[in-house]
UniProtKB/Swiss-Prot annotation:
The keyword Mitochondrion does not apply. GO terms for cellular component: extracellular region. Pfam families: Tryp_alpha_amyl. Disulfide bonds join C31-C72, C41-C61, C62-C87, C74-C94. Belongs to the A9/FIL1 family. Keywords: Disulfide bond, Secreted, Signal. It comes from Oryza sativa subsp. japonica (Rice). This is Protein YY1. InterPro entries: Bifun_inhib/LTP/seed_sf, Bifunc_inhib/LTP/seed_store.
Amino acid sequence: MAVTRTALLVVLVAGAMTMTMRGAEAQQPSCAAQLTQLAPCARVGVAPAPGQPLPAPPAECCSALGAVSHDCACGTLDIINSLPAKCGLPRVTCQ
């Protein structure tokens, strides 16, 4: 019974979030909504096995990426870059 109530609550919350996001997208997509649309990029967002080439992004990924605003992209990268210090971890450097 508790599992059923929990499952129902999860479905209701997910439905409410979806409706809220759709309403926001009709006006001006929030940064979170823009980033959610990047799901088709997931398989190219993870480093391949050593020696394997990075797969080409699907057209859906490129389209979604083109719809992410400059402010959203830069703000997200700023947040990601600030996390190590906030977690007491060394700064990540990439080559």
